[in-house]
């Protein structure tokens, strides 16, 4: 099995296409930014949480990989995007040659990061949930779809006032 790194994940055109597709779909639905800025933030923050808690560097890197890929299911549909994303991630990571035990960590976290249905199923999963939900920034609000009744838009717009 090949050791898959975050750099390999970031360089993969299929993963990039799914991130872009997810972001475009969510833009059309009026959701906040879910593109490279968001996945970069979630990737870094997931890794930082795990590092601060004393996890080994491979677990930290798996957290970073998970953060980068966590929203690819939105390229298909917003509803159940965690489960769809886990299925997509399985195929992509398996094709890249990642160890199946590591794939299980990544897809378990992706499949459980949605607030409606997910629960933290391990350290990477818990760190991902915290990192994802902590991403609040004015730049996430799309200028053409700001909704003062949407809690996500209100929180994001309150940053840096």
Language-model features, listed with the residues they occupy:
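N-terminal low-complexity or amphipathic/hydrophobic leaders
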Residues: 41, 45-49
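Non-catalytic interface/linker regions that flank or bridge core catalytic/transmembrane domains
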Residues: 1-17
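Serine/threonine-rich low-complexity intrinsically disordered regions
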Residues: 2-5, 43, 160
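Electropositive phosphate-/nucleotide-binding environments in soluble metabolic enzymes
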Residues: 16, 36, 40
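Divalent metal-dependent catalytic cores for phosphoryl transfer on phosphate-bearing substrates
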Residues: 27-28, 38, 51-161
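N-terminal glycine-rich anion-binding loops that anchor highly charged ligand groups
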Residues: 13-21, 58-61
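Short hinge/gating elements
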Residues: 23-31
